[in-house]
């Protein structure tokens, strides 16, 4: 299953034509194995420019498999991921990326992202990346 992170949904929503946008569009069109998690839903909905757009985005996201964020397991997992990344010389800019990574790791999901920071985190902790992009991940 491919866990699409916030940056992938933003690419899709803006129809950027990037490789990540095209990959997520393909997965959606073919009923591919796409999942979301609450931290991603939170970030995507927070970026909505209106209540109507928020409702549209919520309907879209909730069509896909939900990897529930487990507060007991995933908060601790995110803290361990953050610490491990720092020890490897990669300091994540935000804990939400570590929360998303913790969920992906627990479910053994592949991440689809255009976020350079989350890409580095995934590489440090050994999460598989769905890498359709020809362009480099965008800095956060």
What are these regions, as identified by a protein language model?
Residues 1, 101, 105-140:
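Acidic, PIN/NYN-like endoribonuclease modules and their adjacent C-terminal/linker elements
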Residues 6, 38, 94-98:
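Conserved glycosyltransferase catalytic-site signature
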Residues 31-32, 65, 108, 126:
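Residue-level detector of structured alpha->beta connecting loops
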Residues 5-6, 44, 78, 104:
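Generic structural signal for small/hydrophobic residues in well-ordered secondary structure
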Residues 9-10, 41-44, 118-119:
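A generic structural signal for short hydrophobic patches within well-formed alpha-helices
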Residues 1-36, 46-59, 130, 138-139:
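Short, well-structured N-terminal submotif of metal-dependent ribonuclease cores
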Residues 66-114:
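Active-site neighborhoods of divalent-metal-dependent phosphate/nucleic-acid chemistry enzymes
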Residues 27-28, 85, 104, 122:
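A generic structural signal for well-ordered alpha-helical segments
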């Amino acid at each position: 299953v491919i866990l699409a992170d916030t940056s992938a949904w933003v690419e899709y929503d803006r129809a950027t034509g990037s490789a990540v946008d095209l990959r997520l569009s393909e997965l959606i069109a073919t009923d591919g194995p796409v999942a979301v998690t609450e931290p991603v839903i939170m970030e995507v909905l927070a970026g909505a420019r209106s209540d109507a757009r928020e409702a549209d985005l919520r309907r879209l996201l909730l069509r896909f498999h939900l990897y529930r964020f487990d507060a007991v397991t995933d908060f601790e997992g995110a803290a361990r991921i953050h610490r491990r990344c720092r020890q490897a010389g990669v300091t994540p800019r935000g804990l939400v990326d570590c929360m998303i990574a913790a969920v992906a790791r627990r479910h053994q999901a592949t991440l689809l992202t255009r976020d350079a920071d989350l890409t580095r985190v995934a590489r440090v902790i050994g999460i598989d990346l769905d890498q359709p992009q020809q362009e480099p991940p965008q800095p956060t």
